[in-house]
Structure formats: structure tokens, C-alpha cells
Design a protein with these regions (language model features):
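Repetitive helical segments and hydrophobic/amphipathic motifs
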Residues: 13-16
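Extracytosolic ligand-binding ectodomains
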Residues: 2-10, 20-410
């Protein structure tokens, strides 16, 4: 059965060698522990989010390391280790603790899964290292659970809700029911989107929560159907979003209700196809085909992986490059000094435009409102989006005045 989505008037929501930043790295005298910087990639290698990060994240980080070595020729070694956190907070935090204690890891990144990231953030602060959350979405990471040792890099649930959520409500989608992944990310995405809906005159009629990597969405979708809400907001991601959409199609739910995918990635569109997703509006921090810079990186990535990079994978490359440049500029791998350099240096590369890291660790940068093309409009493989608007980081992300982070001076 063909699945009907929000059209242009009432659009469903999704959130979602390379050039370096224009600023030159000014090296200081080097004082690197063991004369080596070691980066850990903690990701989902085999689960529901593996297409978003996974092996592609490992590839992106290795590309960043290789490119940095070639361009800057640092006088210290750079190595990478990686592991599968299995979407379990205890597995992830234990692995990171082991890396810090026994393997000399200086920085950990990717970190898909907000529950894992919240646990890793605590260990990272305790061990005085650095973690850069690229794949996680919960705003808790820069609000009540912020630390001086962590950065939230690519996107968050506030930006997802704020950029495109308003468009849905203002174009008639004013009653909502949420289908929510039952962990930190899903809770955060539901809350932030609910706030946007209510602030713009809409109503939230209810919600239901499903476990991560749910095997059957029928009972949850039937509750959503019974609510008679105009919009069923999918506060989940990856395989859960894909399976939610497929199940809704099978049950015929979209005859009378519309689905809003609150975080989707280009790999989700690729899996579902343009026939299913045409007309959707999405918010993302990256699109492979945006300009010559993104295409140049993406071609190299595609040659290695046979798919185009997600926002997370491109963000991993950018985050690692930003970190390594800060190490050179600081002349040390000591976390506080490196973090100070990162926060004081603008970020402008193929991934982040007008980027900067705020005092709460939130990296703000331009976000993009895009629309999924019709099949007839797509001219080549992965030609999926039209960019409809560029939203500045200051407008897309939560204002510092609303931050609950104790590091923010008010």
C-alpha cells in the first residue's frame, strides 16, 4: 500500500581531500603525552543506528586523521580505536573508562545514542578527557548534564523541533500524538517538539513509548490512530523510524493522519525511496550535494563505503579535524587547554558554516530546511533534497538565556 506523507502545504518533518577551515593553525611548542594523540570512536556497529554512524563513522574519522597528517604534518602520532556500545549505557561507559585508564585515549567521538552519551559524559569529566557528541540528540547534554569536558556537535532535539516544527503547525498540523523511543533522546525530542507545537497554538493529544529497536509497532500505531490527531510525530530514529513508517503504511493509518519523522537521515530516505518520502520537509545540518565542498568530501567517502555520508558521519570528520587543530594550537593534549582553543576558534569547513562552540558545549552552526524531491525531479543517485532555507545557528539552537547548564554565566 502506498504511504501518504505530508505534502508541501503541510510537510512532514525530518530532522535531520576535504577543505579545512580557513583559519590557519598556529602551532605552539608541543607537549603531547606519549607523543601520541589517540581518538576513540564509540558507535553503534550493528544495531538500529548503525547506518547513521557505524563503520561509516570509523571510515570518516580515519579520513580526518589521514587528511590532517597530510596537511599539517604534526610531530606527534595520531591513532584511532573503535568499539560497539550496543546502545547500552553501561557497555559504552565501561569501554570509555577502559580506554581512558589503560589505552591512553584522549578524545571520544561519534557517540550515537543519548543514553550512552550521558553516561560517557560523566566518565569523561571524571577522567579529564574530551568527548564530542556527534550522533546524540538530547539537549540534556548541554543543559543540566553539561560538563566542561564535552561538546555537542552536529544537531540536537531543540533544533530539530524549532526549525521545521513551526512550519507543520502553522500550515495546519495543529493536533499531535507522539510515538516515542523510550530513552533520553526520544523523551527530549518529544518534549522539545511538544513545546513548539503548544507555543504555536497547537495541541498534544497524547503519546506512547516504544523500546529501542522495537520488533512490532502495530499496538503503538493503533493508539496513535485512535487519538485522531492530525499529526503522528515519530520521536525516534534510524531503523525504528523506517519500521514505523512501513508499519503505518501497512495499516493504512496515513489515509486520515499524517506522519512527521522528527529525525531522519539520508540513509532513511534511501531505504524508503522517493515514492514514499516525496514532499517531506526535513531539517539537517548536512547534505552531501549542497555545494562543491560537500560533494568533494562525499565523493571520497562514497568511494570507500559505496554510500553517501549522513550528517553524523560528516560531523565525525569535522569534529575530529576541529579537535586536532585545537591540539596543535594549544601545544598539548591536556583537555582544558584543548577545550579552551576549541571554544575560542570559529569553525568553517564543508560540514559547519558559521560554527562556534558555546560555553555550555553546544556547537552552533547553520542548519538547513530541505524538501525531499519527487522521483521525477531526481536526476542522479542520491539526488534527494532541495534546500528551502538556511537557518543560522543562533536562530536554530536553544538560546543561551534558556540554558540550564551551570557553566553558562547569567
Amino acid at each position: 500500500m502506498k504511504y501518504k506523507l505530508l505534502n508541501v502545504a503541510l510537510a512532514a518533518l525530518l530532522i535531520p581531500a576535504a577543505n579545512f577551515a580557513s583559519a590557519e593553525v598556529k602551532p605552539a611548542a608541543m607537549n603531547i603525552s606519549g607523543n601520541m594523540v589517540k581518538i576513540g570512536v564509540l558507535t553503534d556497529m550493528s544495531g538500529v543506528y548503525s547506518d547513521l554512524g557505524g563503520q561509516g563513522a570509523v571510515t570518516a574519522v580515519q579520513m580526518a586523521i589521514d587528511d590532517f597528517k597530510a596537511q599539517y604534518k604534526p610531530k606527534f602520532a595520531i591513532e584511532m580505536v573503535y568499539a560497539d556500545h550496543q546502545n547500552k549505557a553501561d557497555v559504552g561507559s565501561n569501554k570509555v573508562r577502559e580506554w581512558y585508564d589503560t589505552e591512553g585515549v584522549d578524545m571520544v567521538t561519534d557517540l550515537l545514542n543519548s543514553g550512552v552519551s550521558l553516561a560517557v559524559g560523566k566518565v569523561t569529566q571524571e577522567k579529564k578527557r574530551i568527548a564530542i557528541f556527534v550522533g546524540s540528540g538530547s539537549t540534556r547534554l548541554t543543559d543540566q548534564d553539561c560538563t566542561p569536558n564535552t561538546v555537542h556537535y552536529a544537531y540536537d532535539t531543540y533544533a530539530l523541533a524549532n526549525v521545521a516544527g513551526k512550519a507543520i503547525v502553522k500550515n495546519g498540523g495543529d493536533t499531535w500524538f507522539f510515538l516515542t523511543a523510550d530513552y533520553a533522546f526520544g523523551h527530549s525530542l518529544e518534549k522539545d517538539t511538544s513545546d513548539v507545537v503548544k507555543a504555536n497554538g497547537g495541541k498534544v493529544l497524547g503519546s506512547v513509548r516504544h523500546p529501542l529497536n522495537a520488533s512490532d509497532f502495530s499496538s503503538y500505531l493503533l493508539q496513535a490512530q485512535a487519538s485522531k490527531a492530525k499529526i503522528i510525530g515519530l520521536a525516534n530514529a534510524g531503523g525504528d523510524t523506517i519500521n514505523s513508517i512501513k508499519a503505518a503504511s501497512e495499516f493504512g493509518i496515513t489515509k486520515n493522519q499524517q506522519l512527521a519523522g522528527l529525525l531522519m537521515f539520508i540513509t532513511d530516505i534511501h531505504a524508503l525511496g522517493l515514492q514514499t518520502t516525496q514532499g517531506m520537509l526535513l531539517t539537517s545540518g548536512f547534505y552531501w550535494d549542497k555545494d562543491d565542498e560537500t560533494r568533494k568530501f562525499s565523493k571520497r567517502f562514497f568511494d570507500k563505503t559505496k554510500r553517501n555520508p549522513t550528517m553524523v558521519q560528516a560531523g565525525d570528520y569535522s569534529a575530529v579535524t576541529t579537535y586536532l587543530k585545537a591540539v596543535v594550537a594549544a601545544g598539548t593534549d591536556e583537555a582544558a587547554a584543548v577545550m579552551a582553543k576549541m571554544k575560542s576558534t570559529p569553525i568553517n569547513d564543508f560540514f559547519a558554516k558559521n560554527g562556534k562552540i558555546r560555553e555550555n558545549g553546544r556547537m552552533i552552526h547553520d542548519m538547513y530546511l530541505m524538501q525531499v524531491k519527487k522521483p521525477s525531479e531526481s536526476k542522479y543517485p542520491w539526488d534527494y533534497y532541495d534546500i528551502k532555507a538556511v537557518v543560522s545557528g543562533e536562530d536554530a539552537f536553544q538560546p543561551l538565556s534558556a540554558s540550564q547548564c551551570p557553566l553558562v554565566k547569567k
